[in-house]
Every structure is written in C-alpha cells, then in structure tokens.
Amino acid sequence: MSQLQMKLLRRKIEKRNAKLRQRNLKLQETSDTSLSQPQNGDVPKETGKGGKVKKALKRSVPVDSAEAQSGGMPEETLENGKVKKSPQKLTTLANGEAAPTPPPDSEVKKKKKKKRKMANDAGPDTKKAKTEESAEACEEPEDDVKKADDSEVPSLPLGLTGAFEDTSFASLSNLVNENTLKAIEEMGFKRMTEIQHKSIRPLLEGRDLLAAAKTGSGKTLAFLIPVIELIVKLKFMPRNGTGVLILSPTRELAMQTFGVLKELMTHHVHTYGLIMGGSNRSAEVQKLLNGINIIVATPGRLLDHMQNTPGFMYKNLQCLVIDEADRILDVGFEEELKQIIKLLPARRQTMLFSATQTRKVEDLARISLKKEPLYVGVDDDKEVATVDGLEQGYVVCPSEKRFLLLFTFLKKNRKKKVMVFFSSCMSVKYHYELLNYIDLPVLAIHGKQKQNKRTTTFFQFCNADSGILLCTDVAARGLDIPEVDWIVQYDPPDDPKEYIHRVGRTARGLNGRGHALLILRPEELGFLRYLKQSKVPLNQFDFSWSKVSDIQSQLEKLIEKNYFLHKSAQEAYKSYIRAYDSHSLKQIFNVNNLNLPQVALSFGFKVPPFVDLNVSSHDGKLKKRGGGGGFGYQKTKKVEKSKIFKHISKKPADRRQFSH
C-alpha cells in the first residue's frame, strides 16, 4: 500500500477513535449511575477465591444501561445474545460500587498488531473483509462491541495492480488533477471499467505496462488519464517539446483517440496535436516547431518527422504509448516501430495496449519495455473471448445466394446501425455503388479512398442513429462507433483474432448490446472449429430462405447493361478470388474448392470473368485460376474446365468465348 493510502486510512481511524472515546466516556458515566442504584439490593461482594461479579451485575443493570453498553444496538441483537462480551474487567471499589477497569495498553497494541498482520496476509478474495476487521480493531480498543456494518472504512488494494475495490472515478481524486476529473464527469463517465481500474493506478506510479483486454473495454481512457496527469505534474510547456507519444495503427483510430484526448484536455492549458498520413505535412511541421506536449500519431508519418523535421524536439519524451500494438505490427509498421524506439530516449515510461497477445507483441514488449513491466490481462480467466452483451451466430449460405441474403438482410435492417465487412477494397467499392444504385443507401470506408473522404464518412456514420457502413478491416481496429446494432461478416476473416476485432465494433462499454452475423459457405464450416479454440461461441441462426428476395435475374441484367457497374463488378470478383487465395487458413479457405460459376452469380455474372492467379500445381508448374477472357472461360489444351493455366510461353492463346 502506498504512503498516501496509509495516510488516508490513518486519518479516518483517528477521527473515528476520537468519536468513540467521547461515546465511551458517556457510557462509563451511565454505567456508574446505574450501578450505584441497583434494583435488587446491594451488589454482591467479590468472593474470596477471586470470583467475578459479572452475573450479579447482569441482573442488576437496568435495560437502558445495557443498551448503552452495547453501543445502541437494536433489542433483537441483545436478545439473541450476539453482542460480544466486553474484555473490560470489573473491580469492586471501597464503597462497594463496581467500576470497569480498562485493559493495559500492551494488550491493545498486541491485538492491533495481530489483526493488522491477519489483514495483510489475507488473499485477494478475503482482503476486504479482513481490512474491515483490522480497522475495527484499531478503532475500538475500549469498546469491542461488534458493528453490523462499516461503510466508512476504505477498502485496501486488491491484487498486484494496486487498484481499489471502489471503481468510481471519484476515488482517484487524490491522484488525478481535478480538471481531468471534471472533464471525465462532463463526458458522462462515472465508473471505471476493469482495464481502467487495474491500469490507471500503476501507470500513475510510473510503471511500464503490457495490457491485454477485449475490444470495447475502455483501453483509451486507461492510458490517456495517466499521460495527461504526467504532463500536468511535470508542468510541461510548449518550449519543452513533446512529452508523450501515442501511436495508433490507422488514421481513423488516431483521429478517435485525439478526439477523446481533446475532451479530456478541455480544462488544461497544455498543447496536444494529431500527426498522420494524408494530412497537410507543412502545417504539422509548424505545429511541431511551436511545441506539442502530447502527440497522437500514425507510425509512418511520425518517423518521417523524426528523421526530417529539424525543429521536432522529442528528446524530452517521458512516455510512449502503443495502442493496438498487434494491429500496428500486422499492417507492416514493425520496422518503423523499431526505428522510432531507437530514436526515443531510453529513460521513459512505456505502455503497450492490445486486444490480443501475439508473439510479435511479446517481441515488441522486449525491446520497448525497459523496466520490469506489469502485465494486466483482464480477460485471461474468461471462458469467452468476446464481450458478454454480444449475441453472435452464423448462417450457412451457398456461394450463388450470398448477395441475395445480404440484400434481404440489409433491407430488413435498414433502420438499424449495421457494419458489413468485406475482404477487399474493390469489393466494398462495387457493393457500395450497386446498393446505392438500387435504392438501398449505404456508406463505405476502404483503404483506397482519400483521407478526407474516409474522415467524412467515418464521422457521418458515428453521428447517425441508423445506417449501413460497408468496410474492410481498416475499420475493424479500435474504432469506437456508437451503438452499432449488427456486425455482418460477408467475407470471412483471415483468422479468429480478426473475427474478434471485427465483432468488437458492437456491444462496447459496460452494458453494451449487439449482434454479429458470420456468413459461411458449406465448405467453410471448419472455421467454426478455430473460433471455438479461440473461445468464440457461435450458434447457427435460422434463416427463412423463402423470404429471401429473388432479384438474381434483375441483378444479372443490370450488370450486363450498366457499363460502370459491370467494370466495378469485374474488379470486385477478381479481388475476392485473390483475397480468398491469400487466406492464411488454406485447409478451409481453399481457392481450388471454389465453384467459380456460383461465385460469379453473386457478383451478377452469368459466366465468370477471367482472373489471373498463380497457384502451385502438383507437378510444380505455375497454373492460373479464373474464368475466360471477358465473359467466358478461357480454354487451353491441358486444363480442366474449372482451372486455367498461366501462359509461360509467348504462343498465342485460344481466345474463344462462350456465347451468352
């Protein structure tokens, strides 16, 4: 327990002891008065063998004085005999009156030490109960009557993290600046989530931290509150340069973290800024020259400034935060991170926050966490890897009916807030154009959009009460989009961890609720095994196929006649096949098992378009998968209908097409 917490406890105990002394004096006066006027004659004298007068006293003391001695406890308690017998000994005065004798000081001290030791030795489960006992032992040396309840005594820290049982933000009042607490209150937060309550105190003490928690568990506030407190305590000024760096994997997450930081800094005067790819570099340089105390950044742009902006002062850095560490490594920032860590001063506090712990994250922890780090894993003992308020399931759907199922589902839930995940940018682009064309308004976010467009769309969807957002995995990490009702995974994720991040966009916060739907082909059901191993429970959703909109013929006519949709559908189909071919779980998502004509139907094609894919054959030669040039199958002499070889020689290929 820290000194601050001990002082707090001592102060409480001293106040209570003062009150108890006054009460005990009154009790003694009352007992003296009642004992001097016994109801049943004189008080019996002490026996020659040193016998005590307790029994006689018990008969002679009136009811009022008995209640007084019991500390004002209800009559039921007295009748049931639950009041502890006082350890005070009675002696007979010369005039025959009995008076209580207080126990010697040494005995009281022994009891205090003994009970304190018992409280300190207690495990995390029993510590709160033991603490109350120890507090009562300190507070009531003269009157050992048992209390029914004691809510004033603060509970001691639990576990390794030093976090109080009290999870309200108000409990941080002695550790966190009042301006920060005021901002938290204005944001509407009353209680800390588990990751916050386990992380904030050790981070305020300056510990290095490696934290793992489910998506939507409140990791952002868990690191922002301590870093703001660090800057405030050090009285950082713009001329001191940058004191805190917060790294985010995507621009959207960086913007969101910056937004939360902006709200927390409402009542502070320190400078803060956002640095990310896609924004005006010269404006960022000017801000850095003026001095930014807290920077939220994406790794690529940050490294660029560290290497090429001479006036960027980062040598005074006190703290480095890496948010969504596993995602930063996944999207190819490993080298940039290593270079950034080398350039930063070695004496600093480091925090790594992540939703999943991978080997790469452990490697990053080894090179970035200098001091003995504290590991906080709030979900390690949980049976389920996803949040409790999430109802999740899957639907088995053949390839040719995938779009019909999606269209029916979105049409039915158009008044709700829905996110649909695709495997490629081109697939998002095509479905965005198609659905809007057929009067089902949707939004889209993908990596090939310009940053301004991505930002506008992101905030538009965040602020909307209902709507449909089509996206790639760029939106699956860390983004806190409020009140998402459904997560639909139209294309299956690359692995179970990616599934967890995708569904983490819904059912966020303490009492969040949401639904998740995974669409699988019959050949892909083996993926459920991997999800089960990753503690993801899925039930099969019932779907009435008779209610599915049969718009296949209209879709095919539309794609055939509309040139722009036709080109977009071709690119989407090709990117879907290529993404499928690059899947990490090839034993389940095997591109050779795809029925291309059926897959093509879901994109509105009667005949599959040609796709240039290099896949290894049994004889070691390179082969090509896909449909024919333009609309038909491309046929060569040594190929089955479902496969197309890659052209190795420069001989002219057979370009015949099926009529349609």
UniProtKB/Swiss-Prot annotation:
Subcellular location: Nucleus, Nucleolus; Chromosome
Listed Basic and acidic residues bias regions: 124-133
Keywords attached to this entry: ATP-binding, Chromosome, Helicase, Hydrolase, Nucleotide-binding, Nucleus, RNA-binding
Stretch list, region Disordered: 16-153
Residues noted as binding ATP in the record, renumbered to the chain: 213-220
One family name in Pfam for this protein: DEAD
Domain Helicase C-terminal: 389-559
Chief place of localization: nucleus
Helicase ATP-binding domain boundaries: 200-375
Motif Q motif: where in chain: 169-197
Annotated catalysed reactions: ATP + H2O = ADP + phosphate + H(+)
Motif DEAD box in this chain: 323-326
Gene Ontology biological process: cellular response to estradiol stimulus
InterPro entries recorded: DDX18/Has1_DEADc, DEAD/DEAH_box_helicase_dom, Helicase_ATP-bd, Helicase_C-like, P-loop_NTPase, RNA-helicase_DEAD-box_CS, SPB4-like_CTE
Subunit composition and interactions: Interacts with NOL8; the interaction is RNA-dependent. Interacts with PRC2 complex components EZH2, SUZ2 and JARID2; these interactions prevent deposition of the repressive H3K27me3 mark onto rDNA in pluripotent cells.
Role: ATP-dependent RNA helicase that plays a role in the regulation of R-loop homeostasis in both endogenous R-loop-prone regions and at sites of DNA damage. At endogenous loci such as actively transcribed genes, may act as a helicase to resolve the formation of R-loop during transcription and prevent the interference of R-loop with DNA-replication machinery. Also participates in the removal of DNA-lesion-associated R-loop. Plays an essential role for establishing pluripotency during embryogenesis and for pluripotency maintenance in embryonic stem cells.
Protein name as catalogued: ATP-dependent RNA helicase DDX18
Protein source organism: Mus musculus
